[in-house]
From Swiss-Prot:
Gene3D superfamilies: 3.30.70.1730. Signal peptide: none annotated. One of its GO terms (cellular component) is large ribosomal subunit. This is Large ribosomal subunit protein uL10. The lineage of its organism: Bacteria, Bacillati, Bacillota, Bacilli, Lactobacillales. The keyword RNA-binding applies. Forms part of the ribosomal stalk, playing a central role in the interaction of the ribosome with GTP-bound translation factors. Pfam families: Ribosomal_L10 (PF00466).
Length: 166
């Protein structure tokens, strides 16, 4: 192989390794068998959520994973592999791909990484069942509001009972 080609591939490995290091979550899938329409729909859904989705050669993925400290992921890079990277929302790629896989039998989740740790297919599917960041924040706020609301109701009840006595 010429030195120019080797340099270009090394640059690709570095670029993918940087994406892997920066990603909050990574989902690796086998998209073999998807129709063009299904693939386009999946890519559009991921793009709308700020998720980058690419088909990358397994040799480049394997070297990039090793370089990014995700050597445990190397077993996933067998057969056709497409990778979804999300830098912000940990749940988004897993949720979108898992939901899409329910309707498109050809899409198979292989595994991935969650916040820098290699994860199995089952871990990714469990992550997909969680609410997204906004959903979790709203759940947290409702939990925090409940005690305050109960105190307010108690104060109101005491005030009403004192009015009834007077």
């Amino acid at each position: 192989m010429s030195e120019a080609i080797i340099a270009k591939k090394a640059e690709q490995v570095d670029l993918v390794a940087e994406k892997m290091k920066a990603a909050a979550s990574i989902v690796v899938v086998d998209s073999r068998g998807l129709t063009v329409g299904q693939d386009t729909e999946l890519r559009r859904s991921l793009r709308e959520s700020g998720v980058e989705f690419k088909v990358i050669k397994n040799s480049i993925l394997s070297r990039a994973a090793e370089q990014a400290g995700l050597g445990d992921m190397k077993d996933l890079f067998v057969g056709p592999s497409a990778v979804a990277f999300s830098n912000e929302d940990v749940v988004a790629p897993a949720k979108i791909i898992n939901d899409f896989a329910k309707t498109a039998d050809a899409l198979e989740i292989k595994g991935g990484a969650i916040e820098g740790a290699a994860s199995s297919k089952e871990d990714i599917q469990a992550l997909a069942s969680l609410p997204n960041r906004e959903g979790m924040l709203s759940m947290l706020l409702s939990v925090l509001q409940a005690p305050v609301r109960n105190v307010a109701y108690a104060v109101k009840a005491v005030a009403e009972s004192k009015e009834d006595v007077a």
